[in-house]
Structures are given as C-alpha cells and as structure tokens.
Amino acid sequence: MIKVGIVGGTGYTGVELLRLLAVHPKVEVTLITSRAEAGKCVTELFPTLRGHYDDLYFSEPESHALGACDLVFFATPHGVAQAMMKEVLAAGVRAIDLSADFRIRDIEVWEKWYGQQHGCPELVAQAVYGLPEIHREQIKDAQLVACPGCYPTSIQLGFYPLLANDLIDPRSLIASSASGVSGAGKQAKVDLLMAEMGESFKTYAAGGHRHLPEIEQGLRDMQTPDAAEPELTFVPHLLPMIRGIHSTLFARLIENVDLQALFEDFYANEPFVDVLPQGVLPETRSVKSSNICRLAVLEPQSRGTVVVASVIDNLTKGASGQGIQNMNIMFGFDETMGLAAPALLP
C-alpha cells in the first residue's frame, strides 16, 4: 500500500484521479490540496465520491506535508508543479506531473509556447516522458514522470508503428484532432458556453497549438536514427461533447506493407491499445471513462496515403488514467491495476 497526495484536486483531471484511485487496491489517498477549497471535505464538492473519501479534506499545498507521501500527483495548470517540484523530490517523494511543465526538453521551446520563464529548468532533463508504450523501462525507475498531453497521446500512439519501422515520409505528417470541452478545463469562458458551442464544430489554434512541440519531440524519439526530422501539421477542433478525443492521422507511405498486420503485431502485448479489426473504425464513446486507446489503420483508395483513426478519453488515457498507469509501473504493480473497467455505454 502506498500513500498518495494530489496537488490541485478540484479540476477535471484531479477528480478523475480521485475516481480511479478510489478503487485501486494498493493506494491510499492521504492528502489533497486546493487553496480555494481548503478546509472542505472532498465529498462536499464531489458527492459522487461519498463512501470513498468521507474523511479526506482539502488543505493548502505545503511541501512538508507532501513529504509524508510516497507519490504526489500534480493535477495543476502549467507553472505550478515547477515551483514545488524541487522540494518534493528532495524529500524522497516520487512525482507524476499531469501538466506540461516537464514534457518538453528544450527549455527555450517550452518558454516560447507557454509564455513564461521556466521555474525549474534543472529538473527537466531528469523527467521521464510518461507514455508507457514507448518509455516503459525508463518509467520503472523514474523519480519524476511528465505525463503526456491528451492530443499528444492520441497522435503518438497512432504514428508509432509507422515511424518506428520507417514506413512513412516524416515530412508529410498531418493530424486532424477533435476534443471534447473538458480538455479546456473548468474555467468559465464565453466560447465554451452551451449556447456558444452546442450543435457546432470548429477549428481552433490552427496557427499553432502548444501541444505541437511536445508531439514532434515524441515523434522524433520513436524514429529510426537516420530518419528525417518529423514535420507535423496539427489542426485541433472543438467538439460539442464533454470528454473524448478523435485524431485522424495522415502520412505518405514509402513502403507497401500489410498495415493491419503491422498494427496488430506491434500492439499485441499492450494492455491499453486496441487495434480494431479491418474495416471497423473507432468511436469516442467506445473509450469513455476508460484507459484504452482504440486504433484503426487503412489506405483509402490505395493511393499511397495511410490513415490512422485514434480515439481516447482525454481525461483518462489522455491524463489521469495514464498517470495511474505510470504509477503502477513505477511501484511494480500490475500495469492494469485500477484501470481494467471497460468504457461506459451509452
């Protein structure tokens, strides 16, 4: 049994962590922080968790209290984890950061895209990028894991078999991705009102989304050594639904192979990647509240362009569920522990 703390427990990723950890047999959540809600019981804010956290109260985030944990999750906006991480790690506590603070290795690139000076650049090189399907061995011994973003997870898992086998032109990559509104967090914004985005579908951040450098860094990591630098055109969209991501990926093939067999063999031993049968395409509802990434691969009209459809739940495999998957690996638990429930339907 390990003691877990959560910094930033009132956002969507924080409450998703609470939901999933409530049934994890090897975890006790002993600390949860929120400056705004300090002193309140968790179940006062989240009645769905009654019976699981009736004695757990929000507190101010203090490093000495976090030092009593075995592991701390940061479910905070960017900029928060980097201000506290040095003290947490110095106390011998391992950490999983769900924010973007430690994902991008090039500090200048991070500062450009996130618009602020990085508060703890010396720890960036120490952080392990927490995409288990690619970095499982490094995650096992990591003190600090940077959990991938939601779009990066869906896109990297879709391109991985193709780039790792040098089967596509890395300068031809396109990702058209769509997310539910929970990916934008809980802030009150006019463009996220039901009257504004309901029954509608739109492109946003087409000129440059801050997940782009993270994705391209991850794509480079999975390539063969002599491959050209990946160039990705990434266009995100907003869907009028709460949770889920659908990424449609395109690339030019440079070698003809049995794509279906390639994907099935490549992911045969991955518990959270499901390659659908040939001719079956994934739906976001098929992964709702689950830690599964579902993939389909095809070559439409046999014209040399491979298309991959990739779906995840942005709050689960795209955030908190993947964080718990990383935790399981770090502490030697079964990787699927606490994450085996199937998707919700309807």
UniProtKB/Swiss-Prot annotation:
One example of a Gene Ontology biological process annotation: L-arginine biosynthetic process
Domain of life: Bacteria
Pfam families attached to this UniProt entry: Semialdhyde_dh, Semialdhyde_dhC_1
Enzymatic reactions: N-acetyl-L-glutamate 5-semialdehyde + phosphate + NADP(+) = N-acetyl-L-glutamyl 5-phosphate + NADPH + H(+)
EC id: 1.2.1.38
Record has Protease as a keyword: no
Localization terms from the record: Cytoplasm
Membrane spanning residue stretches: none
UniProt xrefs under SMART domains: Semialdhyde_dh
Active site: residue positions: 150
Keywords tagged on the record: Amino-acid biosynthesis, Arginine biosynthesis, Cytoplasm, NADP, Oxidoreductase
GO molecular function: N-acetyl-gamma-glutamyl-phosphate reductase activity; NAD binding; NADP+ binding
Record-level GO cellular component terms: cytoplasm
Family stated for the protein in its record: Belongs to the NAGSA dehydrogenase family. Type 1 subfamily.
Matching NCBIfam families: argC (TIGR01850)
Protein name in UniProt: N-acetyl-gamma-glutamyl-phosphate reductase
Species of origin: Teredinibacter turnerae (strain ATCC 39867 / T7901)
